[in-house]
Amino acid sequence: MIIFTANINAYDNIPDHYYDGDVKYVMFYDKPIEQKGPWEFIELDCKYDDPILNAYHTRCMSHLLFDEPHVWIDGCYTMTEQFVKNSKEFVERNEITQMNHPAKRTLLGEVLKTYRLGFVPEERLYRWCKKVAASGFKPSYFDHTINCCIWRHNTSRVKEWNEYYWNYHFVDGEFCHHIGQATSGIAEYLVFGRDRIPRVPLQVDLSLSSRVKTYGDSYNISENINEDEFRSKARKILRAVL
């Protein structure tokens, strides 16, 4: 089993993890970082000028990196002995596993969060909603996950899921930052349908983060100020409940 992460734009400090001798650890980076622990540090062949896109691409398109069972973890969260033990069980049991979000939102609620925090300009989000509606995705299907950890094998279904997970970040060639919890749900619908992806409880402590940069250090934040109007229009496009 491989556990991998990406420390792009020196966004995180490496936490004090528990390391298992039977696990291979791989960290991708683009700028000089402190290298500690038994990681294999690999300088990323960056495909994009935006460091966030490089980090997202690494997380989403894991089938391009590994043939073995592999676990993504955001670089700011700490792995415990129990985390590694559970990870071995998850990859033994399922071809892909996701975590239930501890504070679930609807699809529209997730889009509104993205709007409210300014990660995506309003006009682009409207176009993204239209793309989702055109896919046939039903908002009632959406079961909110948190993707700071994902357990995967390199199978044909996982490859297809990865590609939808990545591609639904884009609309008309423009990237929609911080909407991956929605795009993973769309990917699940398009690939797995009624089969669903197995869910597990949260496996990391979100309150313990080694992140050293703010969103403003890496994202171009938009000033979205018409939330009531946006909610009404996006709801009609998606045919979604609040």
Language-model segments: residues:
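Short, solvent-exposed loop/turn segments at secondary-structure junctions
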Residues: I8-Y11, P32-I33, K47-D49, Y77-M79, ...
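Residues that flank catalytic or metal-binding motifs in active/ligand-binding sites
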Residues: G21, R59, I73, H144-N147, ...
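Short acidic (Asp/Glu) patches
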Residues: D50-C60, K85, W128-S135
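Short beta-strand-to-loop acidic/aromatic patch adjacent to the donor-nucleotide binding site
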Residues: E68-Y77
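Catalytic core and acceptor-binding pocket of nucleotide-sugar-dependent glycosyltransferases
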Residues: R116-D228
